[in-house]
């Protein structure tokens, strides 16, 4: 038996970091939404009880370090599943980009194996399991649009933003999330009012959403990596309505309301950035 599952990327419309917790994680308050740039997870049952992972992208681990492998191993051990699974990941989401590609692969594996192994778990139960794998996995189990608090595992699903285009641009650099958080001084930065973003989303106020885009991690990443700052500036110059870095970077996204501007922005960015994508916000979960 086989199962194919999409694993969409996410962007942060708002990302606030409140403080470092005693357990070493940071307390966050984020608004995330999924876009229609997605990896594909192909799951094939195997009778020998083993788990294997193959990936189309050479830079992604294909062993126990892979989050999809960890998701399968967790489900198999927790629910005493005898069967194994072969996992093939077709990567479309850029790697180490701030778009939760690995977390989304893990979440898609949880959802797909829940069906394939006939476990009958709810999304809420899968999200709790996802939190054991990584902070973004719980959100990715649901997809759609949500507020994430705690270390990212407490999910409150909210309405979807109005339909719009999203331009994604990833410079050819890697960003250490741990280093960004280590350098972040939460007492010396401006913090977003997350409720304002929620109100704009629920009111389908595109201009309000663009106005309230805020990511406190930009205060670190833009100084460490001038390439990210340059992409933000160029995206604004080419005509994006709202521009923000996603996660800890280095990917920058631009929200665009008019399709007539999308190609111009895309072409302009492709002049100096190889990984550029024109996608749409998916909308509600399950779309």
Curated annotation (Swiss-Prot):
Recorded catalytic activity of this chain's protein: 4-CDP-2-C-methyl-D-erythritol + ATP = 4-CDP-2-C-methyl-D-erythritol 2-phosphate + ADP + H(+)
GO molecular function: 4-(cytidine 5'-diphospho)-2-C-methyl-D-erythritol kinase activity; ATP binding
Record-linked InterPro entries: GHMP_kinase_C_dom, GHMP_kinase_C_sf, GHMP_kinase_N_dom, IspE, Ribosomal_Su5_D2-typ_SF, Ribsml_uS5_D2-typ_fold_subgr
EC number in record: 2.7.1.148
Pathway(s) per entry: Isoprenoid biosynthesis; isopentenyl diphosphate biosynthesis via DXP pathway; isopentenyl diphosphate from 1-deoxy-D-xylulose 5-phosphate: step 3/6
Record key words, sorted: ATP-binding, Isoprene biosynthesis, Kinase, Nucleotide-binding, Transferase
Disulfide bonds: none
Biological process per Gene Ontology, one example term: isopentenyl diphosphate biosynthetic process, methylerythritol 4-phosphate pathway
Top EC class for this record: transferase
Residues holding ATP: 94-104
Residue positions of the active site: 10, 136
Family according to the record: Belongs to the GHMP kinase family. IspE subfamily.
Known function: Catalyzes the phosphorylation of the position 2 hydroxy group of 4-diphosphocytidyl-2C-methyl-D-erythritol.
Name of the protein this chain belongs to: 4-diphosphocytidyl-2-C-methyl-D-erythritol kinase
């Amino acid at each position: 038996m086989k199962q194919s599952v999409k694993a969409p990327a996410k962007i942060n419309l708002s990302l606030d970091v409140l403080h470092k917790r005693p357990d070493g994680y940071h307390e966050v308050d984020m608004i995330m939404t999924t876009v229609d740039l997605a990896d594909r997870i192909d799951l094939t049952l195997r009778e020998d009880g083993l788990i294997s992972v193959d990936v189309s992208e050479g830079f992604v681990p294909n062993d126990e370090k892979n989050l999809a492998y960890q998701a399968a191993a967790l489900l198999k051990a927790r629910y005493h599943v005898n069967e194994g699974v072969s996992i093939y990941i077709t990567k479309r989401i850029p790697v180490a980009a701030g778009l939760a590609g690995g977390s989304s692969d893990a979440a898609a594996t949880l959802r797909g194996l829940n069906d394939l192994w006939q476990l009958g778990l709810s999304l809420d139960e899968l999200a709790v399991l996802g939190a054991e794998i990584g902070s973004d996995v719980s959100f990715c189990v649901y997809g759609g649009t949500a507020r994430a608090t705690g270390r990212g595992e407490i999910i409150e699903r909210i309405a979807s933003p109005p339909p719009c285009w999203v331009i994604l641009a990833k410079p050819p650099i890697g960003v250490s999330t741990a280093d960004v958080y280590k350098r972040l001084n939460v007492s010396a930065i401006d913090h977003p009012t997350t409720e304002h973003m929620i109100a704009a989303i629920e009111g389908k106020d595109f201009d309000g959403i663009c106005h309230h885009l805020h990511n406190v991690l930009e205060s670190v990443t833009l100084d460490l990596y001038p390439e990210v700052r340059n992409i933000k500036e160029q995206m604004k110059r080419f005509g994006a309505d709202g521009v923000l870095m996603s996660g800890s970077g280095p990917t920058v996204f631009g929200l665009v309301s008019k399709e007539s501007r999308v190609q111009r922005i895309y072409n302009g960015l492709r002049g100096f950035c190889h990984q550029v994508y024109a996608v749409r916000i998916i909308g509600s979960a399950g779309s």
